[in-house]
Amino acid sequence: MEANTIFVQIASYRDPQLIPTLEDMLEHADNPENLVVCVCWQHSADDEPIEIFLDKGFLPTRYYEDEEMGYNIIVMEKDGATFKIIDLDYNDTEGACWARYQIQRQYDGEKYTLQLDSHHRFVPEWDTKVIEMLESLRSEECPKPLLTAYIPSFDPENDPGARVQVPWKMDFDRFIPEGAVFFRPSAIDHWKDLDKPMASRFYSAHFCFADGIFCEEVPHDPEYFFHGEEISIAVRAYTWGYDLFHPHRIIAWHEYTRKGRTKIWDDHTTPEKNAGKVKLDWVERNNLCHKRNRILFGMDGEDPSQIDFGRFGFGTVRTVRQYEEHAGISFEHRGVQQATLDRLDPPNNVEYEDEEEWKASFARSNDVHVCVHKDAIEVVDDFDFFFVGAHDENGEEIHRKDLGKEEIYKYLNSPNGFIDYRMIFLSAKRPASYTVWPHSESRGWMEKLDFPLDY
């Protein structure tokens, strides 16, 4: 293999930005001949025929069948780069993580790997810059650096004018009810003062650069669907000895809006399943994925030993507890430490003597789905507010955030008639129920509605 070969991984689902992304990658690469790009091309022959490649100068050189999986792979060349296109009807895919795993099966010893989505733009000489950045981190104390981030955004309809020119990092957002951790991007405020990448708690599936062997050591679990992908890879990578970092300079941009793209949840629906076009609908796959993620982390009383995760489990270089200490989150308690909320650089280094002190260092991250149809409420024309509160198992109020008049009637007059939103908050205790209690200017308190939370 060439010394600085890069195995580029791109899972693309019916994305009109795929070809522009590949062209921009090639145009701005310093050494395109070092690129081996594998695309899991989940597409419809009607709106994405092979001509979208041929018309842009991609030259097919070989065509063969993956006998184990039953799909075809088209090998192409352009500008010295090699492309392996996994040709897959969009009805045959099993989700983003499954597609990423199919790509990783094509890894062939390249020195580095870069995982992306199919909607990016790149800085000039991006390949040289990202290699230099990674190698600047390598040492005896850090033998396996990994670069990752929710990279800054661009807009294909206003490009390059709308490109954000500040590098981004990843901050904790919340534990969702199903158990996965969500993140949000934010600017690296002091990026101009940095001469190296900054330490990271988390991993992004749309930008990850590491040694090529990462494809084999921490492969995507094909039984994951979407949510849970990034937090599971973050912890698995950390336990395999990888140290996570955010780039301190921009390498590429990502398109976040999904505008103009058909998504898998638009296609893999219950009617399509009933018609025999897909094996499972996206909701079924999503629920199975969430269950698998909770089992992996032993959340909500799940026993991790009920599944043999094999190569999709944790590594042996570090423990999950060491990751939790680094990141300042607790899977068992769905907890987050203040330093993580304050967006301070990791590791948190919180000292504790025993499990009680460890637990006490966290606030519980809650995401309560409030959902009430107007038919459950006696609707009057002079509501002034709704009490909305969460309670623990003893009925004690642990959070309250009322709805005002404008919000109330916006929901009640909506086409579906649902009061439907998420109540996100921190607390010391676990919420067991929530209450919606309407108040009228003329009638005072009306019927109180209580809803248990099912974990």
Residue ranges of each PLM-predicted region?
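Catalytic cores of eukaryotic secretory-pathway lumenal/extracellular enzymes that build
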Residues: 2-310
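Terminal low-complexity segments of carbohydrate-biosynthetic enzymes
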Residues: 159-161, 182-195, 199-209, 261-455
